[in-house]
Amino acid sequence: MIQMPPLGGIFLCNRGVMTLAATRLIALHKNKGKSVAACLKSRTDYAQNPDKTNKGELVSSYECSPLTADEEFMLSKRQYELMTGRRQKNDVIAYQIRQSFKPGEITAEEANKVGYELAMRFTKGKYAFIVATHTDREHIHNHMITSY
């Protein structure tokens, strides 16, 4: 059982070891010369790279399919505009949370669960997100991308 304080890095994993994860919130912006859809696809494709996520086994999601998350994020933006008549005023297209763990302190599967719980706390269950756990470096780390 993993216990976490509100949007923090300290948690208690099931082995009874206290751990601190480096966590960073990043606003994702549209790149010049690219559409919002192309930027979202690029970001979600990078996060879900099969070479970094054990062939996709370390990807989880909430209220969207990992296979179509970028398209679903775009649909959500369009629905917001239609329902409210308002467009987003800033150029933030999504948010990413990156979470890194010290080498050897957590398994990839545990890291994905911790990332999912953190993304759920951040979104309060109101927004779709994906969590992709990367194992391509010495330290295991998560990329969590959420629409808003």
Model-inferred region functions:
Residues 2-148:
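N-terminal nicking endonuclease/strand-transfer module with a His-rich metal-binding environment
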